[in-house]
Every structure is written in structure tokens, then in C-alpha cells.
Amino acid sequence: MYKQIEIFTDGSCLGNPGPGGCAGILRYRQYKKEFSAGYHITTNNRMELMAAIIALESLKNSCQIILYSDSQYLLTGITQWIQIWKKHHWKTADSKLVKNIDLWRRLDIAIQPHNIKDWRWLKSHTGHPDNERCDQLARKAAKYPLNKDFDNNPVVLYNDNDLMKID
């Protein structure tokens, strides 16, 4: 039986491109795990993708997942475009390579062990506590980026010792 995990993600960028941050919250029953990471030069779309990737890659076992995001780019890409891109060798309709192909491939790999029950859109800045918290963490990470390049090695800026470990 899969553990049922809810994931909330957000990305932020101060300029596009510019310093950026990503953040997420993973919920399992009464437990919660938060993360954030900042990068010196990136884009808002890369941060939205990285938030989902970091969350999914942090899970040690296969889980049933509902992922919430305010990013239409992430949600439309993963639910509609990705299968077409893969079928066409990661190229768009005009035969150009998909933007952020490195992260789309990484996200595609990250979802494989899991049962993704749903990808859900949340309108941003409407008061949903987990979405607002992710936004706050992502913006803070963008203000204090610790990675010189987008090197896929996030530095955790926030980690509550009382939070759960999802095994």
C-alpha cells in the first residue's frame, strides 16, 4: 500500500533570468516536511520545475501523490506536453529542443516510482496556507541564493528538526 503524500510547490525569480528560489511542503498524515533552495542565475519556470523535482526526489519509497502548484507551465507540461515531447525526441512542434529539457527529463524520471494520483492547480496568493508558505520560502531563497550556477545541488535553507522523515 502506497503512503499518500500531498506536495505543495512554488518557484520564485527576482528578474527573469535572475536570482531564484524554489520551495515545497510534503505532507503525510499529521507530518510535514519543508524545503527551499536558492540559485544565483535561473528563471521562474526552472524554479517551478525544481520545486517539484526536489520534492519527488526526496521520497525514499514509492508513494501515492497529489501535487499542488500555481504554475500552469509545470502542470500543463507534465500532464499534456511531456508525452508529445518524448514521442518527438524532446522537440517542440517547430522542431526545436524543449526549453528546460534537462529539468523536464529529470522530472520525468522522478515521477516514475510513484503513483501520481493528481496534479492540481492552486491559484496563487489566495490565502491557501501551504501555497503561501511555499511562496514565502521560495522568495526568501531567491533573496539569499547560495548556488553560483544552476548545478542541481540545492542547499537547504530551512529544515525543521521536528519534521518527518519520509521513508
Curated annotation (Swiss-Prot):
Keywords: Cytoplasm, Endonuclease, Hydrolase, Magnesium, Metal-binding, Nuclease. Its cofactor is Mg(2+). Binds 1 Mg(2+) ion per subunit. May bind a second metal ion at a regulatory site, or after substrate binding. Its EC number is 3.1.26.4. InterPro entries: RNase_H, RNaseH-like_sf, RNaseH_domain, RNaseH_sf, RNaseHI. It catalyses: Endonucleolytic cleavage to 5'-phosphomonoester. It comes from the Bacteria. Mg(2+) 2 binds at residues 10, 135. One of its GO terms (cellular component) is cytoplasm. Residues 1-143 form the RNase H type-1 domain. It is an enzyme of class 3 (hydrolase). SUPFAM superfamilies: Ribonuclease H-like (SSF53098). Pfam families: RNase_H. The keyword Electron transport does not apply. HAMAP family: RNase_H. Endonuclease that specifically degrades the RNA of RNA-DNA hybrids. Monomer. NCBIfam families: PRK00203.1. PANTHER family: RIBONUCLEASE H1. This is Ribonuclease H.
